[in-house]
């Protein structure tokens, strides 16, 4: 007997990211991870970024000071966050 159950590829977190609203034009990657509550503090941000565990727009990023702009997507630990302008 064949299995006719529909199988779907798992959705990547980047397909439905949560929003990270920022007031300025740019934010540094380490700050964004903290603001999005993806890490506890700057030390944790440094460790996970330097270990290559964080992706920006689908590419591994190892620079904590990487500047993110509106529209950039951060992925870490199964979560995705999109940098967007804050409502004024």
Map each language-model feature to its residues:
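Short, well-ordered loop/turn sites that connect or cap secondary structure elements
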Residues: 48-49, 68
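Short hydrophobic/aromatic patches on the structural cores and recognition surfaces of FHA
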Residues: 45, 54, 71
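Ferredoxin-like alpha/beta domains used as RNA- or RNAP-binding modules
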Residues: 1-35, 60-63, 67-88
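Short, structured beta-strand/loop micro-motifs enriched in basic residues and often containing a Trp
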Residues: 51-59
């Amino acid at each position: 007997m064949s299995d006719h159950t529909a199988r779907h590829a798992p959705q990547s977190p980047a397909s439905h990211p949560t929003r990270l609203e920022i007031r300025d034009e740019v934010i540094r990657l380490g700050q964004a991870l903290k603001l999005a509550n993806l890490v506890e503090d700057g030390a944790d941000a440094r460790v996970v970024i330097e270990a290559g565990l964080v992706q920006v727009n689908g590419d591994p990023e190892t620079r904590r000071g990487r500047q993110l702009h509106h529209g950039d997507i951060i992925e870490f630990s199964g979560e995705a966050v999109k940098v967007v302008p804050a409502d004024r």
